Curated annotation (Swiss-Prot):
Coiled-coil residue spans: none
Presence of keyword Amino-acid biosynthesis: yes
Enzyme Commission number(s): 4.1.3.27
List of residues binding chorismate: 304-305, 419, 439, 453-455
Stored Pfam families: Anth_synt_I_N, Chorismate_bind
Other remarks on this protein: Component I catalyzes the formation of anthranilate using ammonia rather than glutamine, whereas component II provides glutamine amidotransferase activity.
Name of the protein: Anthranilate synthase component 1 3
Homology family: Belongs to the anthranilate synthase component I family.
Pathway: Amino-acid biosynthesis; L-tryptophan biosynthesis; L-tryptophan from chorismate: step 1/5
GO annotation (BP), single: L-tryptophan biosynthetic process
Annotated binding of Mg(2+), by residue: 331, 468
Subunit structure: Tetramer of two components I and two components II.
Length: 503
């Protein structure tokens, strides 16, 4: 089962390389069968270098990926100054990278045989819109990506043993023969590490009583935020605003162990583990912000939530309630309209289409209303331009987007950071896939941070909106409990008083 098999022959590699410009990357592919891709990642990773693991369970990409030890890091700091032309430093960093990196894939079918993998903060929005600086900044970067020239990929969903495609993408400068041999060496080394490496994670378990999540505000203060937004709705400033609060707890268990538990507790279409300098992300995101494949664009907005039922019958009743709720239907329609308009900014005229409308997707703790919107990218529009058009997602800001982001900054105490930004990947042959970073633990400064939010409209009930945020947090907190080896009581504390609901 652990035999390494090369599927790229030298002749086809050389033929592809000779037809490409100098500096182009050309993949060399090896294959190996493993019992579990995440175990392979745990064996290949190293405590002293960056790594990523992206897993889909029915998302649009249909593939999972992992990589270790990037050849380049791309980071934009929290205090980045605007570009000379007034543009976004973060998106210009992406543009610059994609301008100098090119892939000629030959017969390789892996969508991302190499690329830039990482995350963008919600605060990239400050580079795109004039948002007041009223929330507290904790210094987290605006953007962190690693350039990985050798990755492991596999098709999702999978059951039982999995064939992993290890793709190494050396640059071809002068000698295609030498590049081919470099590629074989790179692919072989990653495959061998994935099979035979040692698992380096050493969690230091902490008593669950010392790992209780605490809300920055609690139910009463969150209700005040909801009432403040409802006043803005009455005044005509906004139709809908997504408001969140931050939960924190000591980092009692390693992010790798936490993500392993997340995979079992709440598998999600755009799950991710990122281990980057100073910041680790553990994500169980269900939502796609943007998928680009050549000139084809996709976005998949989520708006409308119910908790899962305790029985199949109760689950069906909750779905009927969700689909018939006029508030949820109206909110979903409004946000689909917003996403259509955003995608239309960079799409060919008449190409934007709602391919699926208000389907119901189920997860371990909640169910959602979901739609799928497609478009065709206009000529001479870059992938970074497409990201700018839709970022941040309308479902986690509100409408109208610019004014709503000002309101968010006014009512939320702390900056969102990675929350409601994006995790994903940029390929080197006109493709990208980015989620919306929700249901995500941020491991920073020896603690876990988990932001959860809810969309507020004119008839929102503050207590119900707070409970919805706890429903959304439940799966991640349960995963932390499982990684701790505890049966979670799911209790939350505010700064001043204990609250039922979350641990």
């Amino acid at each position: 089962m652990t035999e390494i098999r090369f599927s790229t022959d030298k002749e086809s590699f050389i033929e592809t390389a000779r037809a490409a410009a100098d500096g182009t990357r050309v993949p060399v592919e090896a294959r190996v069968t493993v019992a579990d891709p995440f175990e392979a990642y745990r064996r290949a990773r190293d405590e002293n270098t960056d790594g990523f693991y992206l897993e889909t369970t029915g998302g649009q990409s249909g593939w999972g990926y992992f990589g270790i030890e990037p050849i380049e890091r791309v980071e934009v700091s929290a205090g980045a100054t605007p570009a000379q032309d007034g543009g976004s430093p973060s998106l210009e960093a992406i543009d610059d990278l994609l301008d100098r990196e090119h892939l000629e894939r030959g017969d390789c079918t892996v969508p991302y045989p190499c690329g830039a993998f990482g995350w963008l903060s919600y605060d990239v929005a400050r580079e795109l819109e004039d948002i007041p600086e009223t929330t507290v900044s904790d210094g987290l970067p605006r953007l962190q990506f690693g350039v990985f020239d050798c990755i492991a990929a596999w098709e999702e969903p999978h059951d039982g043993n999995v064939e992993i495609h290890v793709t190494a993408c050396p640059t071809v400068d002068g000698s295609p023969e030498s590049a081919f041999e470099r590629g074989r060496t790179m692919a072989r080394e990653l495959a061998q590490d994935a099979i035979h490496g040692e698992k380096h994670v050493q969690s230091q378990p902490t008593a669950a009583s010392q790992a209780t999540f605490e809300s920055e505000c609690g139910e009463a203060a969150f209700a005040d935020r909801v009432r403040q937004i409802k006043q803005y709705v009455r005044d005509g400033d906004t139709f809908q605003t997504n408001v969140s609060h931050r939960l924190t707890a000591p980092a009692a268990v390693h992010p790798v162990d936490t993500f392993d538990a997340v995979r079992r507790v709440n598998p999600a279409p755009y799950s991710a583990l990122l281990e980057f300098p100073g910041v680790d992300l553990v994500s169980a995101s269900p939502e796609l912000l943007l998928d680009v494949d050549g000139d084809q664009l996709l976005t998949e907005p989520i708006a409308g939530t119910r908790p899962r039922g305790a029985t199949p019958s109760e689950d069906e009743d909750l779905e009927v309630d969700l689909c018939s709720d006029e508030k949820e239907r109206a909110e979903h329609a409004m946000l689909v309209d917003l996403e259509r308009n955003d995608l239309g900014k960079v799409s060919e005229y008449g190409s934007v289409d709602v391919a699926e409308y208000r389907r119901v997707d189920r997860y371990s703790e909640v169910m959602h209303l979901v739609s799928l919107i497609e478009g065709e990218l206009r000529d001479a529009v870059s992938i970074a331009d497409a990201v700018a058009a839709v970022f941040p997602g309308g479902t986690i800001t509100g409408a109208p987007k610019p004014r709503t982001m000002e309101i968010i900054d006014e009512v939320e105490r702390t900056r969102r950071g990675p929350y409601t930004g994006s995790i994903g990947m940029f390929g080197f042959d006109d493709r990208a896939t980015l989620n919306i970073t929700i249901r995500t633990l941020v491991h920073y400064d020896d603690e876990y941070r988990l932001r959860v939010g809810s969309g507020i409209v004119h008839d929102s009930v503050p207590e119900a909106e707070y409970r919805e945020t706890l429903d959304k947090a439940r799966a991640l907190v349960t995963a932390v409990d499982e990684a701790l080896g505890e049966q979670g009581s799911f209790a939350v504390e505010s700064e001043t008083e204990p609250m039922e609901g979350m641990r």
